[in-house]
Amino acid sequence: MKTPITEAIACADSQGRFLSNGELQSINGRYQRATASLEAAKSLNNNAQRLITGAAQAVYTKFPFVTQMPGPTYASRAIGKAKCARDIGYYLRMTTYCLVVGATGPMDEYLVAGLEEINRSFELSPSWYIEALEYIKNTHGLSGQAANEANTYLDYAINILS
């Protein structure tokens, strides 16, 4: 998985050289943000169920037809609601992984690849997940640098879906 740190090391190593001052400064910047990123990841983990439940409810409120349409991709039955919560949880989990590594690698490798095809195959609307992620972003309860770090990856996921 690519991160700014592993990319800098791979670049320097492929050229048979030590890390440059610029690369070291970039790596240092990541370490300075790491505490806030880990704080955000821990908070999102600890509040995951509340955030997922609230995000699913936000989707049902904004798109009430998803609770009225029959079929496995809609939330008219408990199994559909469980799938919706599972999918929202997947986006939230990828966000915490990105926070831990300090880069979008987890989303790029595990989420983005095939996302459009999955949504099309299962008739899933990206707008549902955008609403869910906006809800999480607006209610995660983080502040300061921890909020900035979390919002960076939530915004990244929202932009992927847009």
Swiss-Prot record:
What does the entry's PTM section describe? Contains one covalently linked phycocyanobilin chromophore.
Q: Which GO terms describe its cellular component?
A: chloroplast thylakoid membrane; phycobilisome
Domain of life, per UniProt, equals Eukaryota
The residues the record assigns to binding (2R,3E)-phycocyanobilin are C84
Q: Give the record's keywords alphabetically.
A: Antenna complex, Bile pigment, Chloroplast, Chromophore, Electron transport, Membrane, Photosynthesis, Phycobilisome, Plastid, Thylakoid, Transport
* Compartments, as annotated in UniProt: Plastid, Chloroplast thylakoid membrane
What residue intervals traverse the membrane?
A: none
Name its GO BP terms in alphabetical order: photosynthesis
Q: What does this protein do?
A: Light-harvesting photosynthetic bile pigment-protein from the phycobiliprotein complex (phycobilisome, PBS). Phycocyanin is the major phycobiliprotein in the PBS rod.
Relate the assembly described in the record.
Heterodimer of an alpha and a beta subunit, which further assembles into trimers and the trimers into hexamers. The basic functional unit of phycobiliproteins is a ring-shaped hexamer formed from two back-to-back trimers contacting via the alpha chain subunits. The trimers are composed of alpha/beta subunit heterodimers arranged around a three-fold axis of symmetry. The phycoerythrins also contain a gamma subunit which is located in the center of the hexamer.
Query: What is the protein name given in its UniProt record?
Result: C-phycocyanin alpha subunit
Origin species, per record, is Aglaothamnion neglectum (Red alga)
